[in-house]
UniProtKB/Swiss-Prot annotation:
Occurrences of domain MIB/HERC2 (ranges): 6-74, 143-221
GO molecular function annotation: ubiquitin protein ligase activity; zinc ion binding
Enzyme Commission identifier(s): 2.3.2.27
Cellular localization per UniProt: Cytoplasm, Cytoskeleton, Microtubule organizing center, Centrosome, Centriolar satellite; Cytoplasm
Organism: Xenopus laevis
Sequence ranges of the ANK repeats: 430-460, 463-492, 496-525, 529-558, 562-591, 595-627, 631-661, 665-694, 698-729
Key words, A-Z: ANK repeat, Coiled coil, Cytoplasm, Cytoskeleton, Metal-binding, Notch signaling pathway, Repeat, Transferase, Ubl conjugation pathway, Zinc, Zinc-finger
Gene3D superfamilies linked: 3.30.60.90, Ankyrin repeat-containing domain, SH3 Domains, Zinc/RING finger domain, C3HC4 (zinc finger)
Protein name: E3 ubiquitin-protein ligase mib1
Annotated residues for binding of Zn(2+) 1: 85, 88, 109, 112
Disulfide bridge partners, by residue number: none
């Protein structure tokens, strides 16, 4: 049977499109995570030949260890007769069949499944080949997607290993562009690529058909996303990879003693104090990871990863047993049995259909233990639980197993086997075990005694760990020093690739880091997830260990297997203190992870304003704020897209982000905010004077987008809007304050595309600009009354009646900024510290705990009095860095020191800016030289100067990176083994690196592109 199955896999697998699998260990042969290749042939039942889209061809394992996953088997021609994809109507389904486990007779093909068709919460069965065992998968909503890359539409290609089409491409080495993925034949979908060559020729070429690869990509393209862990492993018989016979959905217990569990957990997720709940509670298997470890979910909602040897399948009644009981007329339960209610709400809702149904009042009973009161004729159970009684499907409960002699014997036998398994790999008896345990417990005398014995291995392992690693994680410095005297290997790795320094970082042992550093340990060592000790310390939140590692010159910007640097991890963990320390140590903000996000992008995506504030305050080069992802998105695009208002405000005001940068679709941040109807972001960008008439790739302006999203139902809602009008739409006229100052702060207008459109028109958006279809914004407006309103708003703006720069508008703006944000009756007269904002009057300020403008904690409140110099006007200028406001505008311009504290004035902030309005910050150096900036300075000149300044900073940055740090005259063209470099002339004269002072072991010359 096994031989015939292997032959079948070999025949049916040729041509499949594959990606790297769970046991991959071949670096970037494939081009990286997500890159795709084609199964060319099978050398044997254990080996398969794959040609990657980048042209690399090699043998990979498909038995015992599994290097590959099948992303799409449609090119092989495998078809499921009698089936049809219920989305795209493909009939029959060719390739992998995905069958919904929660709907009747609902199937998807691979393209639709990975394209998120049907309900993402529903679980699916994966059926790889007709008649094969179906595998139940986690819902897609809970699963990770990665991007496929390779020969897809947009890729640049040359001829590949199976090319046989003479000079259709114009000759060897000539390039072309893939325009579409097509079918080579009706029975082999997605097995060919249509290419337009640079010489003008175009044709269809094989990419998977019968295992052939006519093309090789020199510049890959994205091919959509796929659920990596849902793809079958090439060559594996059981898609669940279920060690110990455990399947997803099984209920499991832990029947072992705590010490044994902790020993078995080494290298399998470890043990923490929070896991004590698992010793007395039944959990459900919810996943099996790539290392064959079991992920178990508990009634508390926590998920823990276990060594499969720790778990025992619970003695429970499953739905199949219940069904058999029903047919036989007897129930597997008895009155008085103690049962535990299923805690998976989605599952129990499904099971309760036709069995008493589900009620929201049953929610508190999930995961609780109750007693069976009655068994109905259809075997449904009446259970007393949480002081009430409910009817349950017998499949929705599990009987709490009693402790009997048979179970005790089985447990004793199992314990014996586990103990044997735990230590069966130790070659030198029990000495290694004793050494590791003594090191973990800090028993110096016993460790010293064991090390004197000739037959002990100082690097021996117990449960996958050495004595060095155990002592490091537990902070036993004396034992570490003792082990170092006996020439212990400080770089020994455990199953996960973690070294002693990783364990020290995990255990928050800064002193151990010092000892290991003196012992020659590599502080930049990486484990199998490519994590350094710094990654681990940041993820665990160990600030002192982070500082210690950085003090020892640990590299602050190395990337893990996901491409994340410690900066990314600090942002994810919301540790601003660690983030600041990393930035002070020179962490590189510009490094991007595998998804293309640098630290600024990551903070914007996460909506983390405190992290963004730290990043912007310590940004080494201001122009980094406008760095783009590969799709053209800047941090401001991401904040606008996800409606992270505070982050966007920081980027605009503190980061001075360019508001008009366009992504690959030529959309600005304003396009995205209008498209998603994020009114606060729209108001922010327009107030900051973003350009309103930039066109995207379709020629649409933000006003086109606003009117496209406008519907007649939204027009009807506008009739009741407080700030737009209180009569019917024929007399609807938006108030000028609403249109210019914002979109209102409450009511339905916040989500109204129509009010956004009026706001844009009132601020000068062009009503006549046409998109590529020849449509103006008014052509997209279905309501003539709204068209008239838009035209009127635009006309008033053009004539200056509603202009943002008109005197009336400035007065309105000033009045709005001066009124208290709480009561709106009195004027603002209280300065908040330490942020320096003015938001309320003195009567309302005691009630405000956080600043209404920046959300920072208010630590001080100072009422603004009259100018201490002239006593004629109120104080209206905030001095920085002292934070005092004690002088009016005229007097403040003459001061070099604060009259209140005598601190040097570095910057002056006008009253209007403290109220979050617009103004000009005075710089002390300019004032000292007599150059006081004018409030009405031309905006275009300011933008030009800012752009020139950014370019100068970029040029200076490039010079610093490329010039010799010694002579500062010649280009850097010699690199040392430490990673630093100089010019050749300086380098030849040195015996130690001028940067880190390490001895120069070897010199490597660099060559420019012109050499």
């Amino acid at each position: 049977m096994s031989g015939s199955r292997n032959n079948r896999v070999m025949v049916e697998g040729v041509g499949a499109r594959v990606a790297r699998g769970p046991d991959w260990k071949w670096g970037k042969q494939d081009g990286g995570e997500g890159h795709v290749g084609t199964v060319r042939s099978f050398e044997s039942p254990e080996e398969v030949v794959v040609v990657w889209d980048n042209g690399t061809a090699a043998n990979y394992r498909c038995s015992g260890a599994y290097d590959l996953r099948i992303m799409d088997s449609a090119p092989t021609g495998i078809k499921h007769d009698g089936t049809m994809c219920d989305t795209c109507r493909q009939q029959p389904i060719i390739g992998i069949r995905w069958k919904c486990a929660e709907c009747t007779n609902y199937d998807l093909c691979t393209v639709c499944y990975h394209g998120d068709k049907h309900h993402l919460r529903h679980r699916f069965y994966r059926i790889t080949t007709p008649g094969s065992e179906r595998v139940l998968l986690e819902s897609r909503r809970k699963s990770k997607k990665i991007t496929a890359r390779g020969i897809f539409a947009g890729a640049r290609v040359v001829r590949g290993v199976d090319w046989q089409w003479e000079d259709q491409d114009g000759g060897n080495g000539r390039r072309g562009k893939v325009t579409e993925i097509q079918d080579w034949s009706a029975s082999s979908p997605h097995s060919a690529a249509y290419v337009l060559w640079d010489n003008g020729a175009k044709n269809l070429y094989r990419v998977g058909f019968e295992g052939m690869s006519d093309l090789k990509c020199v510049q890959d393209a994205k091919g959509g996303s796929f659920y990596r862990d849902h793809c079958p492993v090439l060559g594996e018989q059981n898609g669940n990879r279920n060690p110990g016979g455990l399947l997803i959905g099984d209920l499991v217990n832990i029947d072992l003693e705590l010490e044994i569990v902790q020993s078995l957990q080494h290298g399998h997720g470890g043990w923490t104090d929070g896991m004590f709940e698992t010793l007395t509670t039944t959990g459900t298997v919810c996943g099996i990871d790539e290392d064959h470890d079991i992920v178990v979910q508990y009634p508390s909602g926590n998920r823990w990863t276990f060594n499969p040897a720790v778990l025992t399948k619970a003695n429970v009644v499953r739905s199949g047993d219940a069904a058999q009981g029903a047919e036989g007329g007897t129930s597997p339960f008895q009155v008085g049995d103690l049962v535990q209610i299923c805690y998976d709400i989605e599952r129990i809702k499904l099971l309760q259909r036709g069995h008493g149904e589900w009620a929201e009042a049953m929610l508190p009973t999930l995961g609780k233990v109750g007693r069976v009161q009655q068994i109905y004729s259809d075997n449904d159970l009446k259970v007393e639980v949480c002081g009430t009684s409910w009817t349950y499907n017998p499949a929705a409960v599990s009987r709490v197993a009693s402790v009997g002699s048979a179970i005790s014997n089985a447990t004793g036998e199992r314990l014996s086997q586990l103990l044997k398994k735990l230590f069966e790999t130790q070659e030198s008896g029990d000495l290694n075990e004793e050494l590791v345990k003594a090191a973990a417990n800090g028993d110096v005398a016993k460790v010293d005694d064991l090390l004197k014995r000739q037959d002990v291995d100082v690097n021996g392992q117990c449960a996958g760990h050495t004595a060095m690693q155990a002592a490091s994680q537990n902070g036993h410095v004396d034992i570490l020093k003792l082990l170092l005297k006996h020439s212990v290997d400080v770089e020994a790795e455990d199953k996960d690739g973690d070294r002693a320094v990783h364990h020290a970082a995990f255990g928050d042992e800064g002193t151990v880091i010092e000892v290991l550093q003196r012992g020659g340990a590599d502080l930049n060592a990486r484990n199998k997830r490519r994590q350094t000790p710094l990654h681990i310390a940041v993820n665990k939140g160990h600030l002192q260990v982070v500082k210690k590692l950085l003090d020892f010159s640990c590299h602050p910007s190395l990337q893990d297997s996901e491409g994340d640097t410690p900066l990314h991890d600090a942002i994810s963990k919301k540790r601003d203190d660690i983030l600041a320390v990393l930035l002070e140590a020179g962490a590189d903000v510009t490094i991007t992870n595998n998804n293309g996000f640098n630290a600024l992008h990551h903070a914007a995506l996460r909506g983390n304003p405190s992290a963004m504030r730290v990043l912007l305050s310590k940004l080494p080069r201001p122009w980094i704020v406008d760095e783009k992802k590969d799709d053209g998105y800047t941090a401001l695009h991401l904040a606008a897209l996800n409606n992270h208002v505070e982050v966007a405000e920081l980027l605009v005001h503190q980061g001075s982000a360019n508001l008009d940068i366009q992504n690959v679709n030529q959309q600005t941040a304003l396009h995205l905010a209008v498209e998603r109807q994020h009114t606060q972001i729209v108001r922010l960008l327009v107030r900051a004077e973003a350009k309103l008439d930039i066109q995207d790739k379709d020629g649409d302006t933000p006003l086109h987008e606003a009117l496209r999203h406008h519907t007649l139902s939204q027009l009807r809602q506008l009739q009741d809007m407080q700030d737009v009008g209180k009569v019917d739409t024929t007399t609807w006229e938006p108030s000028k304050n609403t249109l210019i100052m914002g979109l209102g702060t409450q009511g339905a207008e916040k989500k109204s595309a129509a009010s956004i459109a009026c706001f844009l028109a009132a601020n000068g958006a062009d009503l006549a600009v046409r998109n590529k279809k020849g449509q103006s914004p008014l052509d997209l407006c279905p309501d003539p009354n709204l068209c008239k309103t838009l035209a009127k708003c635009h006309k008033e703006k053009s004539s200056g009646q509603v202009g943002s720069h008109s005197p009336s508008m400035i007065n309105n703006d000033s009045e709005t900024l001066e009124e208290c944000m709480v009561c709106s009756d009195l004027k603002r007269d209280t300065l908040f510290g330490p942020c320096g904002h003015i938001a309320t009057c003195s009567l309302c300020s005691p009630r405000v705990k956080k600043c209404l403008l920046c959300k920072e904690q208010v630590q001080s409140r100072t009422k603004i009095e009259e100018c201490v110099v002239c006593s004629d006007k109120k104080a209206a200028v905030l001095f920085q860095p002292c934070g005092h406001m004690c002088a009016c505008e005229n007097c403040a311009s003459l001061m070099k020191k604060c009259v209140q504290c005598r601190a040097v004035v570095e910057r002056r902030v006008p009253f209007v800016m403290c109220c979050s309005g617009k103004g000009t910050e005075d710089v002390a150096d300019d004032i000292a030289g007599g150059n006081i900036p004018a409030l009405q300075k031309d905006k275009d000149n300011t933008n030009v100067n800012a752009d020139v300044q950014k370019l100068q900073q970029q040029l200076q940055d490039i010079k610093e990176q490329t010039m010799c740090p010694v002579c500062l005259d010649r280009l850097k063209n010699m690199i040392f083994m430490c990673g630093h470099g100089t010019c050749q002339l300086c380098g030849d004269r040195m015996s130690e690196c001028p940067i880190c002072r390490k001895a120069i072991e070897r010199r490597i010359l660099l060559y420019s592109m012109s050499c």
